């Protein structure tokens, strides 16, 4: 099950980590429809949190379960995810969870990062991880060989998130 898998990943991280600082596991927040954030999902998260608490007591490694807002998922923006975590879990439970703040996803959903950071602080939700994706901006002065190199990356293997604007 997903719970068992996540607990095994946490065990492995605790074994491999050379420090007890900044440890986290990223995961998708509850699936891709609103029914996913149900009591069963909350119960499953609580099982993982209980494992992380026990692991922390046993090893000294404090690992956060970091939920990442995903465009088109149950929680497509960080603000809604922060609200959900703040209202569905206790302060003690939230010591072992937080969000994985993906700046690319934030751009796709048109979220202001300053607002997300202040909301997380205000609602006592940890930013357990920050993902900073790099992006390329095409300069019309690129030589033809550079354009060819970029065209090789135009493949679904490399596709992640994108945003377009029309001026």
Residue ranges of each PLM-predicted region?
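Active-site acidic/histidine proton-transfer and metal-coordination neighborhood
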Residues: 1-98
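Acidic/histidine-rich catalytic cores of soluble enzymes
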Residues: 54-166
């Amino acid at each position: 099950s997903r719970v068992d898998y996540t607990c095994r990943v946490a065990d492995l991280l605790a074994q491999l980590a050379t420090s007890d600082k900044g440890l986290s596991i990223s995961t998708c927040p509850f699936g891709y429809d609103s029914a996913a954030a149900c009591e069963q999902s909350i119960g499953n998260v609580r099982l993982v949190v209980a494992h992380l608490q026990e692991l922390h007591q046993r090893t000294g490694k404090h690992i956060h379960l970091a939920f990442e807002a995903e465009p088109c998922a149950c929680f497509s923006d960080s603000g809604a995810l922060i609200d959900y975590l703040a209202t569905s879990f206790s302060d003690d439970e939230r010591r072992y969870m937080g969000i994985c703040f993906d700046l690319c996803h934030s751009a796709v959903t048109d979220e202001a990062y300053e607002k997300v950071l202040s909301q997380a602080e205000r609602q006592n939700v940890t930013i357990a991880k920050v993902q900073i994706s790099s992006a390329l901006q095409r300069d019309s002065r690129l030589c033809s060989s550079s354009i060819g190199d970029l065209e090789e990356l135009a493949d679904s293997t490399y596709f992640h998130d994108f945003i377009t604007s029309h001026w």
